[in-house]
Design a protein with these regions (language model features):
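Hydrophobic, helix-forming membrane-interacting segments
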Residues: 6-42
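Long, low-complexity intrinsically disordered regions enriched in small/polar
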Residues: 42-79, 83, 87
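Surface loop/turn signatures of beta-propeller and other carbohydrate-active proteins
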Residues: 89-124, 169-189, 193-196, 211-231, ...
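Residue-level detector of Asp-centered blade-edge/turn motifs that repeat once per structural unit
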Residues: 125-128, 187-188, 235, 285, ...
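Entry beta-strands of beta-propeller and related beta-repeat scaffolds
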Residues: 129-134, 190-192, 203-205, 238-241, ...
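Short glycine/acidic-enriched loop and turn motifs that connect beta-strands
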Residues: 138-143, 199, 247-250, 297-299, ...
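Beta-propeller blade signature
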Residues: 156-163, 255-258, 304-308, 377-379, ...
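Blade-level signature of beta-propeller repeat domains, shared across WD40, Kelch, NHL, RCC1
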Residues: 409-416, 420-470
Length: 470
């Protein structure tokens, strides 16, 4: 074959191969266009629609990452749909001491980061995780709007949650509902959150379930409708919640509402011998729910509401022990009161908690009798029923030289084991009114859980230096 023939042969071969490549490309383009222009295709949406799985797969058949995410979402939704209501079948674990569980250092970190102003914090768990909760003030500590956040009620407050032991920031916080008083709990299938908002004489509560509003409750006494400021507890889908509407320094109207999937099953007016109820801290075990509350009117001893979520009934009394746990309070007397308030709190108080379990009973309280400083846990056997019971063991959580605040109970009802591990948190308030060189009022959180071991103790203060904010 002469050179000219070789050139012609090579050229012809190249032309044939090129033509085939062009035809393949055209066919591929046509196939893509055909798939994307199928009937019922919503071609104006480039992002996957989670509510339409088949459409999402069509729009993103070429993107393995999106398909994986859709599959994971579907699996999670199926898992949640197959979950059962939580039942309170276990008792409390033996409590010999308390170990550190979580600490967010929110005020320290907020000195140079976008940390939100909060108060009234708590902890609540679900089958997947435990999270910190609090009422945000709609501003950061360093923001100019933090001026005036000493006030409890405003249009800018919201119940937020964020990962355990992280500070609440504008980037990691999830808004649960809007309001200045709250409670929240998980029934095993989904979470119920309740927020109260509105003016003092016309407040109302909105009940959210599975991140949707389900029910509303209007004020009945037109005097600051309010609720627990810590987690509620559910048994077989029934979630009791304690509300109060009325005077903080006189008789008030307290009710126990029973919810299921956010819907109101019934409500009862307060029964028993408790005279005033606010800000209850609740826990559940052996099908019962126990709430330790605040008598802001008269009692330095704490009222207790015991709830039967099966019968949807309750009763109330005071902790009998002479170990007084409200603040302010007088010195501990020799004999306590089971059915009447022990005087000396001067129309004031602070949210608190206890674990009332016979000889396994522990009470929490500020160390100071006159201010919200220090915090200690005291083992007081049979404190609920014995009016002469005294501490036999204790553990300091926060030294009296450091500020404390509200405290409350919580438990991880989904943790493995044959008993429920008791846990609590302490609010570490900083800023006004005690530290009035700054314009804001906020807090950090420390939380502890029970141990069967006899562990050592340590001081767990907020740790922020106010002078760094000046």
């Amino acid at each position: 074959m002469n050179p000219n023939q070789k050139i012609l042969c090579t050229s012809a071969t190249a032309i044939v191969i090129g033509t085939i490549a062009v035809l393949i490309g055209v066919a591929n383009l046509g196939l893509n266009i055909g798939l994307h222009l199928k009937p019922n295709c919503n071609c104006s949406h480039s992002q996957p629609e989670a509510t339409n799985t088949s459409q999402t797969i069509i729009n993103n058949y070429y993107n393995e990452t999106n398909i994986t995410q859709i599959s994971n979402t579907n699996i999670q939704m199926e898992e949640r749909a197959s979950r059962d209501f939580n039942n309170l079948t276990k008792g409390l674990c033996t409590i010999n001491s308390w170990h550190i569980y979580g600490k967010d250092n929110a005020v320290r970190i907020g000195e140079n980061s976008d940390v939100l102003v909060t108060r009234e914090p708590y902890v609540s768990c679900d089958p997947d995780e435990c999270r910190f909760y609090a009422l945000s003030q709609g501003t950061t500590i360093r923001g100019k709007h933090s001026n005036g956040t000493i006030h409890d009620r405003s249009q800018y407050r919201a119940l937020i949650s964020w990962p355990l032991s992280s500070p609440p920031t504008v980037y990691n916080s999830r808004v649960e509902c809007i309001g200045w008083s709250s409670t929240s709990c998980h029934d095993g299938k989904s979470r119920m959150s309740i927020c109260i908002s509105g003016p003092n004489n016309n407040a109302s509560a909105v009940v959210w379930y599975n991140r949707r509003p389900v029910a509303e409750i209007n004020t009945w006494a037109r005097n600051i409708l309010r609720t627990q400021e810590s987690e509620c507890v559910c048994h077989n889908g029934v979630c009791p919640v304690v509300f109060t509407d009325g005077s903080a320094t006189g008789p008030a109207d307290t009710r126990v509402y029973y919810f299921k999937e956010g819907k109101i099953l019934k409500w009862e007016s307060l029964t028993g011998t408790a005279k005033h109820i606010e800000e209850c801290s609740c826990y559940g075990e052996r099908t019962g729910i126990t709430c330790t509350c605040r008598d802001n009117w008269q009692g330095s001893n704490r009222p207790v509401i015991q709830i039967d979520p099966v019968a949807m009934t309750h009763t109330s009394q005071y902790i009998c022990s002479p170990v007084l746990t409200d603040n302010p309070r007088p010195n501990d007397p020799n004999v306590g009161k089971c059915n009447d308030p022990y005087p000396g709190n001067n129309n004031n108080g602070v949210k608190g908690f206890s674990y009332l379990d016979g000889v396994n009973t522990w009470l929490g309280r500020t160390i100071s009798t006159v201010s919200r400083s220090g915090y200690e846990m005291l083992k007081v056997p049979n404190a609920l029923t014995d009016d002469r019971s005294k501490p036999i063991q204790g553990q300091t959580i926060v030294l009296n030289t450091d500020w404390s605040g509200y405290s409350g109970s919580f438990m991880d009802y989904w943790a493995e084991g044959d008993c429920y591990r008791a846990c609590f948190y302490v609010e570490l308030i900083r800023g006004r009114p005690k530290e009035d060189k700054v314009w804001w009022t906020s807090n950090s959180i420390v939380s502890m859980c029970s141990s069967t071991e006899f562990l050592g103790q340590w001081n767990w203060p907020d740790g922020a230096k106010i002078e760094y904010f000046l």
